[in-house]
Regions:
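Bacterial N-terminal signal peptides
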Residues: 1-9
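Exported/extracytosolic protein signature
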Residues: 10-145
Length: 145
């Protein structure tokens, strides 16, 4: 099954960043699909079409134009994507639409532990020392449902 998700459409869904503090920060997202030509060879290609089971990598680039201190970036995970992991250890996830936050392995849905498939939002706290650099990237991966 092929999902008709052009990179621009998918990027727009994944690229909405919510800033919880006052600094002027701009974000942009790019979506790539991971391709394997052998067990040891993997490469990223811009995502123009995605199919169920494709592993995608979303790169969120942020640029700080003004302000001091740290800030928070929140991204909704598209419903067509099952969250897998973030390349940064400073992420928190939500499994309830952004109402509560924590780490996989600590969050619960009813009587069970939440899994990466349950993630609805990803949030990164950018500390003051990283924010002072003025720009950065955050990467997370997922599987197309």
């Amino acid at each position: 099954m092929t999902l008709a998700l052009a990179a621009g459409t998918f990027t727009a869904s994944a690229g909405h960043a919510e800033l919880r503090t006052g600094p002027a920060v701009a974000t942009d997202s790019a979506v790539y699909v991971e391709r394997s030509s052998s067990a040891a060879s993997r490469r990223l290609e811009p995502a123009s079409r995605l199919a169920r089971g494709d592993r995608v990598v979303t790169i969120v680039t942020w640029v700080r134009a003004a302000g001091t201190g740290g800030f928070v970036i929140t991204n909704p995970v598209p419903t067509a994507l099952a969250y897998q992991q973030s390349a940064e250890d400073m992420q928190e996830v939500s499994v309830d639409g952004g109402r509560s936050w924590g780490r996989i392995g600590a969050l619960r849905i009813g009587n069970r532990l939440a899994t990466p498939d349950d993630v609805t939002h990803v949030r990164w706290r950018i500390p003051p020392q990283s924010a002072a650099r003025g720009r950065g990237q955050i990467t997370y991966s997922g599987i197309v449902r």
